[in-house]
């Protein structure tokens, strides 16, 4: 007999974005690439090295496109209904929020403060939230800023919830004046809150330039005589919410932590900091879910926690199998759509397989999954199976895995069994928390190996992600509008190059460690297509080699007077391939509202970062594998725009927020990152000039218009370097780089013509 009542509406829905037309385009491009390879094979000449090199490069490009096609085949994401949450869930689960910072100079405390304030003010019961700030720089300035911010939070949080403010980072919210009647209650509250924020900002700025406050309070005694790489563990409760009823005026817990560091002890960078956050939060609040954000990624959507809970609390098999919920990363100071396009098309594509990769920020994790639980360890109702209970809950096993802290072991048992954690005084856990921050606490445990954030890579996020997927778990992707989190991009070419090198190096490290998808696709529970998706990401660095060669081949052939591309009717393969690919990628950008210029900048920077920054990642990994050197984690510099009231003019948020409208100019410095790009431009210019003056060698296979067009296309893609040769200051290429590149280019021309 059917029930009379209709089923309850879902908290979330999985949305498929399949497009048979886009699949056809992907397959067409793949077919053209295979046709080009077939032509190379049928017309190969053993004496023609260029032909063989071109074939090898194009084989790499074909394999990369095959991986892209696999990713984009079945895109999906989730639509959530947070307004249904209160009707469906009697009591919302607690959430621990983690913020990580490492350098008060490159990551100014005011940026950290704004991120923390935005987290404290989210639309979620304050008694269910706790914010933990990890300071790997052990900076008293960061701690001072947090103390002052916790005072301002008592004004900011009630203001946001009273008026349902969407953007809850003060520095961004106060950039525009409100449209409200003068003298109204809102207007008065707005003015008062803005004044208090300006006082907070001034205090932080004054403290940055002076240290008199350091000796004025006993609370800073722990920071005396400390260095960023040599100090004891510091754990301090900045603010404790003792109300515990979820009132709108309450402010969630705020805890400052800085783990012990010693010069002769490797600290595993951000992964080590995250694992200490997990342990301390497990002692104090032990929430079943954890959000982690970088210090510059503020909350841009107040319902962000509720949206994630819609995924976790949905009563379905998919939700029981979901290990983490990832939000896309977006930036308030960038008008270039590369990351947006990448996340929308490739991010959704991976989400349609086994789930998105963990991106290092803007991600909600399940605590017991981070404690090493596998999907096979769960019963149908999501609880531990009898075998898993014996495996995980034996005290001896837990001590060996998690360390010798009894309090930590007890919190792990509670988390694995999903027991509610009783409220307690946070300061009662301070002594144990400090012990767990010692350098030797993780020695002979599973932290960083099977538990928590995984080590052995500077990209701890993706390394941890593939470890989770290899245990059978899935993940979910939410693509909200407006973006859930916004951060700041590294400003200038050198900073971007450093970041790209770090990413590519870390990803390539994983390709050669035990988490490699080449191993996982055969002997772990990660799906085959998901392994291929990871392989696409991990091979970023390796792509630099064929791309570098392919940027030089047209110039070599023009100088050597040999053919690179097919002739006659077969040239149509190349023309059609390039034309379809350009139109396809241009459509992807314009479909999302980006301009043709944004598309060009992305295509240009794609070649620049691959041949310049990613190239050094290959060298880094080779030296590491040979034991000659170790990879180093370099913190990228964060900046924030000044807080100024707007004039009321109607501008988009990106236009208002972007602090550097001198964009479009590429910045250079004297580092080696810019040597390959300068060399490529000089070589292709020399080849074009040599063709015009008849410098080509005699008796070659005959280069032609196609090779000349190839050189022109390379110069267009590396146009920032061409402009940099005529600019001065930070926008100009240093003479030392130009002279080195010119010498290499001259050598290349001589060898090409001579051969």
Curated annotation (Swiss-Prot):
* Alphabetized InterPro entries for the sequence: Cellulose_synth (IPR005150), Nucleotide-diphossugar_trans (IPR029044)
Per the UniProt record, one Pfam family is Cellulose_synt
Q: Which compartments does it reside in? A: Golgi apparatus membrane
Parts of the chain that traverse the membrane: 24-44, 49-69, 533-556, 569-589, 615-635, 674-694, 702-722, 733-753
**Which principal EC class is assigned to this enzyme?**
transferase
Q: Which domain of life is it from?
A: Eukaryota
- A Gene Ontology biological process annotation? cellulose biosynthetic process
Tell me which Gene3D superfamilies the record gives: Spore Coat Polysaccharide Biosynthesis Protein SpsA, Chain A
Entry function: Thought to be a Golgi-localized beta-glycan synthase that polymerize the backbones of noncellulosic polysaccharides (hemicelluloses) of plant cell wall.
So what family is this one in? Answer: Belongs to the glycosyltransferase 2 family. Plant cellulose synthase-like B subfamily.
The protein here is known as Cellulose synthase-like protein B4
């Amino acid at each position: 007999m059917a029930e009379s009542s209709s089923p309850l509406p879902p908290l979330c829905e999985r949305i498929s974005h399949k497009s048979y037309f886009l699949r056809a385009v992907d397959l067409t491009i793949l077919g053209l690439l295979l046709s080009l390879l077939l032509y190379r094979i049928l017309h190969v000449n053993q004496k023609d090295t260029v032909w063989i090199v071109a074939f090898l490069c194009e084989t790499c490009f074909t394999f990369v496109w095959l991986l892209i096609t696999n990713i984009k085949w079945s895109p999906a994401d989730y639509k959530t209904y947070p307004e249904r949450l209160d009707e469906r869930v009697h009591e919302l689960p607690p959430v621990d929020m983690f913020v990580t910072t490492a350098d008060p100079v490159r990551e100014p405390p005011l940026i950290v403060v704004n991120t923390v304030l935005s987290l404290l003010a989210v639309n979620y019961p304050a008694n269910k939230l706790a914010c933990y700030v990890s300071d790997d720089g052990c900076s008293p300035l960061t701690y001072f800023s947090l103390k002052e911010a916790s005072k301002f939070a008592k004004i900011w949080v009630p203001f946001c919830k009273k008026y349902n403010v969407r953007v809850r980072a003060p520095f961004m919210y106060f950039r525009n004046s409100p449209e409200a009647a003068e003298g109204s209650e809102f207007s008065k509250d707005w003015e008062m809150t803005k004044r208090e924020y300006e006082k907070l900002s001034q205090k932080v700025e004054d403290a940055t330039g002076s240290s008199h406050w350091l000796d004025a309070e006993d609370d800073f005694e722990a920071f005396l005589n400390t260095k960023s790489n040599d100090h004891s563990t510091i754990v301090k409760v900045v603010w404790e919410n003792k109300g515990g009823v979820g009132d709108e005026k309450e402010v969630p817990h705020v805890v400052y932590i800085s783990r012990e560091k010693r010069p002769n002890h490797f600290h595993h960078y951000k992964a080590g900091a995250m694992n200490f956050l997990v342990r301390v939060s497990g002692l104090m609040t032990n929430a079943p879910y954890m959000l982690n954000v970088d210090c510059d990624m503020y909350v841009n959507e107040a319902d962000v926690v509720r949206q994630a809970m819609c995924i976790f609390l949905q009563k379905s098999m998919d939700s029981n199998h979901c290990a983490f919920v990832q939000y896309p990363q977006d930036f308030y100071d960038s008008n270039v759509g590369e990351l947006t396009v990448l996340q929308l098309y490739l991010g959704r594509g991976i989400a349609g397989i086994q789930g998105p990769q963990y991106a290092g920020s803007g991600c909600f994790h399940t605590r017991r999954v981070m404690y090493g639980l596998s999907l096979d360890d769960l019963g149908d109702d999501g609880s531990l199976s009898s075998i898993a209970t014996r495996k995980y809950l034996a005290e001896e096993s837990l001590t060996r895995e998690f360390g010798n802290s009894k309090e930590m072991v007890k919190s792990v048992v509670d988390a694995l069994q999903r027991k509610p954690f009783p409220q307690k005084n946070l300061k009662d856990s301070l002594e144990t928390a400090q012990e767990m921050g010692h350098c030797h606490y993780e020695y002979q445990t599973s932290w960083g190996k099977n538990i928590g954030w995984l080590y052995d890579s500077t990209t701890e996020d993706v390394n941890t992600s593939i470890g989770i997927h290899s245990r059978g778990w899935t993940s979910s992707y939410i693509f909200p509008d407006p973006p859930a989190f916004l951060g700041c991009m590294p400003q200038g070419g050198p900073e971007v190059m450093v970041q790209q090198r770090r990413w590519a190096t870390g990803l390539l490290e994983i390709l050669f460690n035990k988490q490699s998808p080449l191993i996982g696709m055969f002997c772990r529970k990660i799906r085959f297509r998901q392994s291929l998706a990871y392989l696409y990401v991990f091979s970023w660095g390796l792509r630099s080699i064929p791309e570098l060669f392919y940027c030089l081949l047209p110039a070599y052939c023009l100088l050597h007077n040999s053919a690179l591309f097919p002739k006659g009717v077969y040239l149509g393969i190349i023309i059609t391939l390039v034309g379809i690919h350009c139109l396809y990628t241009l459509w992807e950008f314009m479909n999302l509202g980006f301009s043709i210029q944004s598309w060009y900048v992305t295509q240009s920077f794609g070649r620049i970062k691959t041949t310049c920054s990613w190239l050094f990642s290959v060298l880094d990994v080779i030296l590491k594998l040979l034991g000659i050197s170790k990879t180093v984690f370099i913190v990228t510099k964060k900046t924030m725009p000044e807080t100024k009231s707007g004039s009321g003019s109607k501008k988009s948020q990106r236009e208002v927020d972007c602090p550097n409208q001198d964009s479009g100019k590429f910045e250079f410095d004297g580092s080696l990152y810019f040597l390959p790009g300068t060399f490529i431009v000089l070589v292709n210019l020399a080849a074009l000039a040599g063709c015009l003056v008849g410098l080509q060698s005699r008796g070659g296979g005959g280069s032609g218009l196609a090779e000349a067009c190839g050189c022109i296309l390379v110069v267009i893609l590396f146009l920032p370097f061409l402009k940099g040769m005529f600019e001065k200051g930070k926008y100009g290429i240093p003479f030392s780089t130009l002279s080195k590149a010119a010498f290499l280019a001259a050598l290349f021309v001589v060898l090409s013509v001579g051969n």
